[in-house]
Structure formats: C-alpha cells, structure tokens
C-alpha cells in the first residue's frame, strides 16, 4: 500500500482546508481521521463528535473521516449537518473528548476542510502539523470502535434560548413567561446565506417572541443568493434592504458555517466586528469590572480605549480563532473578538466562537437599551477607517512580503507592532498589513482621526506595498 501524503498547502495554522478533488481528497479525510485518532489514543482520549456543513463534498468527506475514526477504536457520535458552533457545543453537551467539523467555512463552494477541537484546549499549529507527521510515519492505531447518530439541534437551540432575555413564542411558553415579556416586540431580520446555520436560525426564530424575517435559510451548497461571508458589504445588501423596507430593529447574518456574525443596525449601517465588541464589552464589564477582553490586531483603537474606559483590561492578540481561544485560556479573558465577526464568550458560555450565540447577546443588548442600535453606533467615538482590505497573493509570497516590509520599516527607522504582521501607529492613526492564515491573501486596514490623516496613511501603505511589488487594491487607490 502506497504511503499517504497530504498536499502541503492543506495543513493550515488553524485547520485543514483545500480545494475538493484538487488539493483535498476523500483519502485525506480518511487519514485525517486515522492520525487524529492516534493523537487521541496517545492522550488517553476516545470519545469524539463529528458534524458537517452543507457543501456537496461534506457528506463524502465525513463518511471517510468516520470510517477511519471507528476503525481506530474510537466512540464516534455523528451529530449530523449543522453549524460549527453546534459541533463545538456537542463536545461539551455529550461529554466528548474532542470534535471534528467538516466545513469549508466562508471559502468558495469548491473548498472544504476540517476544524478540530479538544474539550480542554484548542487544536492548531504544531498539533495540525503533527497529524502530517503521524501519517508520514504511518503511526496508526487499529481497533473496533462504534458509531451513533445523535441529534443535538433542539438542545443547542434550548441553550441559546436560556440566555435570551426575550420571551419564547406562545408555542413554547414557560410557566413564568409573563414576567419575561418585553416592553415592545422586536423585529429582526436574519440571513443565513444558504449556509449551515439555516436550520438552527429557523428553529430559533420560531421560539423567540419577536417578529422575524428570514432570508436564505435553505441550506444550498451553491450559495445561489450571495456568498456567506458577512465581512464583505455586498453580501449584506439583501439584509440591509429588508431591514430598511420592513423597519427592523436589526439584521443578523452568518457566515457559511455559523461561527461568525454580521450585524446591520436599524438604519441599514453595518456594525463592524470591533464596534460590536464595544457593546458586548460594556455589558459584561458592568458585572465583571477589571476583566480581560481580547481583540485582534485588526481592531480599532476605539475598541481598546472603550474597554479601558468601561473598567476592563484590553489586550491585543493575533488574528485566528484557535490563537484567540488559546490566549483566552491563558489570560482567563471573559470575551474576545475579531474584526471578521468571530466572537468568543467565556461569560455565561463556553469560550468558543459562536455567531448564533453572539446574535442572542446583541439582541439582548438592543432589547434592554432605551436607544436604538443606530443610536448606540453613533454614540461611539468617530474615526475614519477603511474596512478590511484583502489583496490576492500566493501562499508562498504572502509571508515573504510581510518579512520584506518589516525589514524596510526597520531600515527606515519606523517603529511598529509585529504581534501579527505589521501595525504602525503614528499617533494620528495606524495601518496594518498581515498575511491571512486561511486564504491566499494579504489583509490591510487603515484608521485615522480625520479624513486627511486617513489619506496620508493610505499613501504611506501604498508606498510600502509598491516597495514589495504588490498590486495596489482599488480601496487604496
């Protein structure tokens, strides 16, 4: 039998992902299962839950994954099709040692991959590279495992509702629901983008006592309406239109596997991830003053300032869901978030990124406030900033460019933060350039205290990109 070898490009920093039948094959799923099972055996673990998203290749990959896990002697619980946070939830709810999600997240429809987690810590970086080494060494365990189908959808929805301040709809009334009824009935628009969160979103909306408008709830591997990535403004155009036309209090969107959230206020403005984090942080810090809150390197200075003003300890961290979770565990942070809409609640929750739970928490904030979400947005200190700018770049070149940029800035005597890429701070603002760990892109962002200073920062960033022979994106022209 020929020794299996993964394509080098699929073993990423936070997960395994590639293009189905180009760099990622059914055989890879089998050997992901064999190697992960070996890892678990070496660490005295044997119970694992597995789920998949709605991509056309996901059931095929999941079948091979489960086959390998069972043949390696593991107790496998198949929780079916759903969002990534439902899989994370199942690990805790079903008392598993680990979980694997088959998902392409928000990547194009022909992509797919695997997100792995351990109950007691994230699984990433060297752990993922270690799977490749186990496969190379053919260090596998054979055994007679088991497989059981377990439906956790209703339990997951119940868990979401347990922290929702809105009463449940009449078909699910509790004895004391009258005491929970809101002062006004909210109107909420939802957009699953035909991703894996659609069924959960539908079930949840039926049980929250509010008026709901659902967009693209059917799970469809072709994403026929728009791509499920709420960080891209054009993907929120349908949601914005519904919010404005129907007079909604807010609109909520999810990415392809439901671990990220996008939010639109009642005036149709996008609430970016770092703005959303201000609202979450203020709420939590009322009850937990002095708590540590983490934001990624792409976040606005406003967020770090507002955390401090509210009595918290702000901490800047590297972008990446696994890196953030590891930093939360290390610092005992109660909340963390990324510009991309990954929000991690350790306050009242498990500490993993869950776009659906984040939706419940922003609904609570809007419901309990005497101000609209638009009013809350306008009250934030105003800066001039670009959105997250993605510049296409090859896997091989993107990290080289960041290193070249660092060397050039050092020679020029420019100080910068290199916690994750390059973030310069002029006192009037900052710009960032980092290599994405999940896509073949460079990520840039600029923020300043005025339009004039923003333009100066964009000019400076353009010059640095030109030095590295990077094509200047339209957003920086």
Each predicted region: which residue ranges?
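Short glycine-rich phosphate-binding loop at a beta-alpha junction
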Residues: 45-53, 187-189, 291-297, 334
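Phosphate-binding and adjacent anionic-ligand microenvironments
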Residues: 250, 288-477
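Proline/glycine-rich low-complexity loops and linkers
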Residues: 129-162, 174, 181, 266-339, ...
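A short, gly/pro- and small-residue-rich
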Residues: 110-133, 264-279, 349-360, 366
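An N-terminal, well-structured beta->alpha segment
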Residues: 1-67, 71-72, 146-185
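Gly/Ser/Thr-enriched, mixed-charge loops and adjacent short helices
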Residues: 112-246
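N-terminal small/polar loop signature for handling phosphorylated ligands or for N-terminal nucleophile
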Residues: 42-111, 204-264
């Amino acid at each position: 039998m020929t020794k299996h070898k993964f394509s080098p490009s699929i073993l990423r920093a936070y997960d395994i992902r590639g293009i189905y039948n180009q760099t990622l094959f059914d055989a890879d799923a089998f050997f992901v299962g064999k190697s992960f099972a070996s890892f678990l055996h070496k660490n005295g673990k044997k119970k694992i839950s597995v789920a998949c998203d709605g991509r056309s290749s996901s059931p095929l990959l999941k079948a091979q994954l489960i086959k390998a896990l069972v043949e390696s002697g593991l107790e496998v619980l198949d929780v079916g099709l759903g969002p990534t946070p439902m899989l994370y939830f199942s690990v805790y709810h079903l008392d598993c040692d680990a979980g694997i999600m088959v998902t392409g997240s928000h990547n194009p429809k022909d992509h797919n991959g695997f997100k792995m987690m351990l109950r007691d810590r994230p699984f990433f970086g060297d752990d993922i590279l270690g799977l490749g080494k186990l496969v190379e060494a053919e260090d596998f365990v054979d055994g007679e495992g088991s497989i059981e189908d377990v439906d956790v959808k209703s339990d997951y929805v119940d868990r979401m509702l347990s922290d929702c301040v809105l009463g449940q709809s009449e078909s699910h009334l509790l004895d004391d629901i009258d005491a929970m009824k809101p002062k006004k009935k909210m109107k909420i628009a939802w957009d699953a983008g035909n991703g894996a969160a659609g069924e959960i979103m539908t079930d949840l909306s039926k049980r929250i006592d509010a008026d709901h408008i659902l967009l693209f709830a059917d799970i469809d591997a072709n994403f026929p309406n728009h791509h499920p990535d709420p960080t891209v403004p054009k993907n929120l155009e349908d949601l914005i239109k519904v919010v404005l036309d129907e007079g909604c209090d807010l609109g909520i969107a999810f990415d392809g596997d439901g671990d990220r959230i996008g939010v639109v206020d009642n005036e149709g403005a996008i609430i970016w991830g770092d703005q959303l984090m201000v609202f979450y942080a203020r709420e939590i810090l009322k009850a937990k003053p002095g708590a540590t809150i983490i934001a990624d390197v792409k976040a606005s200075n406003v967020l770090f300032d507002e955390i401090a003003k509210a009595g918290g300890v702000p901490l800047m961290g590297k972008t990446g869901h696994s890196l953030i979770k590891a930093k939360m565990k290390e610092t005992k942070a109660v909340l963390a978030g990324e510009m991309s809409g990954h929000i991690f609640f350790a306050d009242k929750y498990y500490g993993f990124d869950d776009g659906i739970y984040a939706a419940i928490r922003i609904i609570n904030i809007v419901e309990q406030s005497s101000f609209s979400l638009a009013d809350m947005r306008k009250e934030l200190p105003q800066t001039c900033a670009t959105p997250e700018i993605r510049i296409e770049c090859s896997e091989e070149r993107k990290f080289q460019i960041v290193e070249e940029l660092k060397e050039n800035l050092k020679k020029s005597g420019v100080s910068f933060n290199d916690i994750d890429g390059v973030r310069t701070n002029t006192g009037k603002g900052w710009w960032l350039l980092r290599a994405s760990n999940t896509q073949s892109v460079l990520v840039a962002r600029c923020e300043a205290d005025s339009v004039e200073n923003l333009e100066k920062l964009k000019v400076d960033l353009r010059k640095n990109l030109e030095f590295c022979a990077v094509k200047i994106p339209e957003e920086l022209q």
